[in-house]
Structure formats: C-alpha cells, structure tokens
Amino acid sequence: MSDSLHTPEEPRPGPGEQLAHAHDGSLRHTRAKGEPRFPDGPKADPAGSHFERRIRSFQPRRSRVTAGQADALQRLWPKWGLDIDGHALDLTELFGNTHPVVLEIGFGMGEATARMAAEDPDTGILAVDVHTPGQGNLLNLADQHGLTNIRVANGDAIILLREMLPPDSLDGLRVYFPDPWPKKRHHKRRLIQPEFLTLAATRLRPGALVHCATDWEPYAEQMLDVLTAHPDFENTQPTGGYAPRPGFRPLTRFEGQGLDKGHVVNDLLFRRVQPRDQHRDLPPSATEAD
C-alpha cells in the first residue's frame, strides 16, 4: 500500500458539529441542542457498559472531528460500522463471506489497519475503538481505497468478546500500542491481564495468533510475563522473548516518531494452543472492580 493512506487536512468542526455557511460565506459549525452527534453513526456507550462495575482499560474522550470524518461516519457507518450493544454477532453475515477474521483492539487513526487490510484482502479485520475521529478516518480510508474487508466497531471490546462473538470465531487478535497506564495505581487498567486473555482464548481458534506491540518497556515486560504464564498461549519465539516486527505490521507515524526519539518497540507474538479442557467455564466479566 502506498503512502497515500494519510489523513488530509480539512476544516475541523467541534465534536459532532456540522459545517454550515455563515453570512460572509465562510464555514461555521452548528448542531441543534439535543441532536445526536451522528444520527446514523456510532452511539455513545451503546451497551450501557458504564453502568457495569468493572475496571476499564480505555478512557473515552471527546475530540474534534473533521468534515471528512463526519461525512464518513454519517455515510458509511450503516454499511461498515457497528455498535457494541451486546447482541450476538454473525461474522459471516457481517463480512459477507467465510474468510478468516482478526480482531484489532485500538486502531488510532486507522492508517496501519487500512494498510494491513489492503495487503491481505482475504482476511477480515474487525477493528474496535471508541475514538470518533479515528473511526471516521478509518471508514474514509476504506472507502477511498476500496477496502471491503474492514468493519469498524464502536464500544467496549470486553463486551464484544464476552457477549457478541461465538467461541472459536477469530483467527487472530491484534493489540498495538495500547494505553500503558504508566502510574502504578493504574496498572490494573492495562488491557493485557490474565482475565482478559482467558476470555479472548475462548473466542480464538487453536493456532490463532495474538500480536501485541508497545513502546513502553515496563508494559512490554508485563505482557511477556502474563502471556508466557497463561496456559492457553505459547510464544512463537524459540528463545521465549520478544519477536521481530512482522512484515504484516506496518510502521506507523506514531511509531516512527518514537523510534526517532530513541524509543524501543517490542512485539510479542503468541499462538493459541489447543485447549486441554474444551468445556472450561468462561471467566466472569473480566477484571471486576474491587
């Protein structure tokens, strides 16, 4: 994929605002009071997950949305987007084929996701995030480059895994540059925890790959420890350490900036092993609050 998968500069409306022409012919941003940000787009907290007493690994934030992103959310969400609302999901129906599907949790502005989709059109990517500009940008990139193997999911990935995806339905899990929650008191918010891996394992087919990447060394060490200790996964590296960056994971602009500053990026590549007990119970609602 060429370097054309970048976000163009556009007028920047406020969160959920629409562009309108002012009397002087310039653009201004308006939204009626009480009007949803995107009537045909992603909903705020679609499954009501914030009423659950559970620690979360993400922090929703309101961000400015460009005109192009807003247009993509309105126009393409009914086609390629879905809200994580707790209802069972049929991946064959969602993608319109029986191709393998990988789950990507957290995709930023979506440029790396779009590149991977372009390089592997026979694999579906179910990309989850709560960042509205990124959702709109990824939809825009998919539309511009004819990438029909991307679906954008809005909401809590735990609910998606726990309530919406059937067992053994995923051929891979990708978690690239998750929030490291660097403060010690926030470490419990990190996504890669034993409870999360136990839940994810029930949705991953034997042989499916779990691929994580981070430039935060302490988090990389925790990921390596947790994945190594988990009985449902094995390290693909004979030495038992970090993996070289696989060719299918593109170098992102964010990652490039970090490398220029001397940051070290660690990739972890683990394989889902054949479960010893096919009837092992699902975990409770992953990472319960105290």
UniProtKB/Swiss-Prot annotation:
Its EC number is 2.1.1.33. It is an enzyme of class 2 (transferase). Residues 1-12, 20-43 have a biased composition (Basic and acidic residues). The active site is at D179. Pathway: tRNA modification; N(7)-methylguanine-tRNA biosynthesis. Belongs to the class I-like SAM-binding methyltransferase superfamily. TrmB family. This is tRNA (guanine-N(7)-)-methyltransferase.
